[in-house]
Amino acid sequence: EDLNKATSALSYGIQKLEEQLDISVFQRQGRRSVLTPAGRLILNEGRKILESTVLLADKAKELATGWEPKIRIAAESTLDHSVFFKVLGDFLTEHEAMDIDVCESVLSGGWEALEHDRVDLLVGAPGPVPLQKGFRAVSINPSEMVPVVASHHPLARLANDPEALKEAIPMTRAVVTHDTAMVDVTRNAGFSMGKKIIYVQTMDQKIEAQLAGLGMGHIPKFRVQRYLDEGRLVVLNLETPANENFIAWKISNKGKALQALAQKLGEETW
């Protein structure tokens, strides 16, 4: 009844399938017919094929109407990812067939990835916006960056003495997240660097390195608020350079999905 087919029609269909594949799909157990292992495999894999077919049809329909099937996004390491993924979740609820590919970028790396078409959308990229690259950029509220060290780091004793800090910083090791640029000139942000640096790959590594007392560095405050409250990290009384963050994409990219997602991200309160 659920299939809206007569029993005879189902039996005939199963018989034809068994003849074509030269296998048994059902076997008798008493008065009941049950699936053979081969039949169970066909059932399970058939469901996947049907789901894939539906998804393919949805993607083809969106593509035919100007909606690209995939968006590649570079999210800056200082970005509040909880806000980002909330917006992304709302977007995917409206566009379930869309594929999303997210990577993390640092400093110049995101702009370079956008310029060289490795990503379609840049979220949270630090300014300034590169000129004459054909980018459309929308400013968003930047993450508050705080200069911190571990409470047991030597600089912690000077945390409230700006003059002493200025003298000590050039001799203190900095913890720096690698710029992800592969072609363009990389850059650093935050402290004026001395000669001693420890480079890490991710913001998580940077936080752990600073908690371990390996050096100093700027970190988004929302990422370390718990450690500040616990007294494991100490904020240094230094002027923090003003920063500006952007959502950016190429002006030449007219994809409807990109435009819709960029608008949602731009309207969000970061």
Segments predicted by a language model, with ranges:
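Hydrophobic residues within well-ordered alpha-helices
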Residues: 39, 113-115, 208-213
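C-terminal regulatory
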Residues: 108, 134-214, 219-243, 263, ...
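Periplasmic-binding protein-like
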Residues: 239-254
